[in-house]
């Protein structure tokens, strides 16, 4: 029932108007982790994120039902409160179908997250287009996010994106510039503007990373490429975000290290 991150967004350039650049953020790297497993009391994923919150700055993507669902799920409510109490930042998941999903439905999901789970103060926008025809669509999402009380939008085209798409007049934006298996990460080349911007403007998620040595390589490359929000996992398949990475403790320490 969950909708998972995709990589087929078109790459036509477009420009946002009235752009602002968020103020530079701290140098420490952070983790952006999709929590696409049901929050049972014994969930290794949820327990691991909770317990690692003292080690690394974590933003967890929350996805109860391909979005917020229509009513409070008591297990999500309890676990979200638990993570919030530990200082984990919480981003609500909405999908946009690369600009084809009705805008009213996206905005409604954003409002529902704030109503059902008020600790969710960040927004994760999946299946983000970078087609010029969708400019007003995403500008409306940014404006609505600010009005609804969100503090930041994480946009996920999952690939290199025209720079104009990575800022907003309404709200700070972080863009996922790489979200794919390990095979493409070593040779990946970020757009030139990435190195000149605050690292907090960018995120990456690398899946199918089978060893701790490759995890360390991925994290170090992300930092070298000026990417602040980092996630690496051994997981793969239709949902590569439903298990705690096998090298979890080492990964959290690696991301948090200067």
Where does each model-flagged region fall?
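Short, flexible coil/linker segments at or flanking structured domains
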Residues: 7-8, 21, 111, 192
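Bacterial N-terminal signal peptides that target proteins for export
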Residues: 1-12
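Glycan-processing catalytic domains of CAZymes
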Residues: 26-258
